[in-house]
Amino acid sequence: FEKAQDHTLIARETLAPSLAHLQVLNSIRSDTYYPSEYRAVNEDLDSIIRTLETTGAPASASQTQRQLLLDMHDLEVRTIGFIQLQQIRNRIAAMREAGAEKLIPRSFSTATMALASAEDLISKAPRADAEIAAQREAAKTAADHAQIILAMSNEVLDADKDNAEALVLRIERWLYNIAVALKYPDIRHLPMDEQSRQLAEEIEGVIQR
């Protein structure tokens, strides 16, 4: 009986890293997001425990625990990635299906690179909460921007002689609204890039006052 107790104690001490990692997986509900992978990790852990309880030799579990910790890390990364980034992944996938790679290559590339950067961070440091939050926000902002550019690009492509002017006037109205808010003279007779330049200078002046 005492020998069995000793072996159980050895198992707990030897597997402390794996048991601690299992608590992390439980805290982020990996069993809910990836039940089969979570079950496999638990089965491997149980198998190692049984081996240690039988042999009482930590060396017998060294290699298998290293692999188990790698598997646990992979599961943690997948879970955190799903929780933090899946909505952004879905949006980017939808844009890709809508032809964004060809229609808005620069904006779409920016969005995919921002997502990849967030995924890379999670794969290396899944518990770096503040950094992950910042990268997720950057990826979300890039995806938001790409969706707006895609929608506007499709409007331009869909425009014909009956609604092309309305589209241009709507864009012009956006600049005019800024001018009105700044109490700036009506400059709609100027090219839009010149309107934009003058309004930007006026805003800069307001900020510096």
What kind of feature is each model-predicted range?
Residues 1-209:
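Long, charged/polar, soluble alpha-helical segments
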